Amino acid sequence: MPQSAQAREIVGFAGNYSSGTIVVKTNERALYYVLGNGKALRYPVGVGRASKQWTGTAMINGMQLRPAWSPPAEVKRDKPSLPNVIPGGSPSNPMGAAAMTLSGGEYAIHGTNQPSSIGGFVSYGCIRMFNADVLDLYSRVGWGTTVVVTR
């Protein structure tokens, strides 16, 4: 596990965000779930590689436990041997225990089948979490939750 991948914890958090907002700081490889009163729950995450990072605001528009995964076209181009669908719960499924899809594209906040990738710049733009952490976050959020991705 990269050194930057620390355990989830409650931390001080400054910023003009409403309680319940998710803030991803890619340079920190951290996801913050804003609790309010200057506090947030910080989770270590894996984020997009340098050429795959994005910033902006999205909303959670889908939530699934043990999701099946259909590799996006870009991933299939890079890894043509991948099947068209990997069933949920399969050890080869990179979505892990849960996924929260984001509006505006093919990105999601999801678990992983590669826990050693947490804390790195590793994905095609998705936000990867330890499976225990994604399940914890999943239990705290719902459809329409605001997600802000910054550097």
Model features per residue range: what roles?
Residues 2-7:
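Sec/Tat signal peptide C-region and signal peptidase I cleavage site
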Residues 9, 13, 17, 37, ...:
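Exported/periplasmic cell-wall-interacting domains
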Residues 18-21, 28-30, 96-97:
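Short, surface-exposed beta-edge/turn micro-motifs
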Residues 23-25, 32-33, 128:
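Structural recognition of beta-strand segments within beta-rich domains
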Residues 26-28, 104:
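Residue-level signal for tight coil/turn positions that link beta-strands
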